[in-house]
């Protein structure tokens, strides 16, 4: 778990990384952001960076698995959310004054070993994020997606399947389901106070 101070640093690092990248056109080094980073940023963690503008999603990309240090994962995810999310055009530099930055630190995903009938009861809304895998298809939804969209566990499972490009009932038909938890830090206003969001 990150402290509030570390959570603020994670969000500031994501914002500064995007701002530097958009102004200079290249990825900054983590220490170029001017954000003081504690030793936790050297640990290997999964992370997602989410950008919203006017209450609407503007970009969301991350590392589901702990495949790099937290600081490197934040740098990569921040730049990708702003410039490589295929659902949206690249963020413009002057847009950043209207964009809220959110960073979700993930636990290691764990497979849910349960029958399809038992599966919905294993999913805790507001606590769990989900990954659904089948063949070459994989989809992920963060823990905050379900409560923010008034989903129950069946809705959440179905939407994660659709995110993977599968039918909504793939979780009933043998797709593998993994859960993880997320610690969410977000700006209350653009480049403003950072809070930890809990559901």
Swiss-Prot record:
Q: Which domain of life is it from?
A: Archaea
Instruction: List, alphabetically, the Gene3D superfamilies matched.
Output: Hypothetical protein ph0010, domain 1, Hypothetical protein ph0010, domain 2
A Pfam family in this protein?
A: AMMECR1
Residue ranges occupied by any AMMECR1 domain in the UniProt entry: 5-196
Q: Which SUPFAM superfamilies match?
A: AMMECR1-like (SSF143447)
User: NCBIfam families annotated for this entry?
Assistant: AmmeMemoSam_A, PRK00801.1, TIGR00296 family protein
Protein name in UniProt? Protein MM_0484
Q: Which organism is it from?
A: Methanosarcina mazei (strain ATCC BAA-159 / DSM 3647 / Goe1 / Go1 / JCM 11833 / OCM 88)
């Amino acid at each position: 778990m990150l402290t509030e101070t570390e959570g603020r640093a994670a969000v500031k690092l994501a914002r500064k990384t995007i701002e530097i990248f958009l102004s200079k056109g290249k990825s900054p080094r983590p220490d170029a952001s001017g954000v003081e980073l504690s030793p936790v940023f050297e640990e290997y963690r999964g992370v997602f960076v989410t950008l919203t503008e006017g209450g609407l999603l503007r970009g969301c990309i991350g590392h589901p698995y702990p495949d790099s240090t937290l600081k490197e994962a934040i740098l990569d995810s921040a730049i990708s959310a702003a410039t490589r999310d295929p659902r949206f055009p690249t963020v413009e530099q002057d847009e950043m004054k209207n964009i809220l930055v959110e960073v979700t630190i993930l636990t290691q995903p764990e497979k849910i070993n349960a029958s399809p009938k038992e599966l919905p009861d294993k999913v805790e809304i507001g606590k769990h994020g989900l990954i659904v895998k089948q063949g070459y298809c994989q989809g992920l939804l963060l823990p905050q997606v379900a409560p923010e969209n008034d989903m129950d566990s069946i809705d959440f499972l179905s939407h994660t399947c659709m995110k993977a490009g599968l039918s909504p009932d793939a979780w009933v038909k043998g797709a593998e389901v993994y859960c993880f938890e997320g610690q969410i830090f977000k700006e209350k206003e653009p480049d403003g106070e950072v809070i930890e969001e809990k559901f």
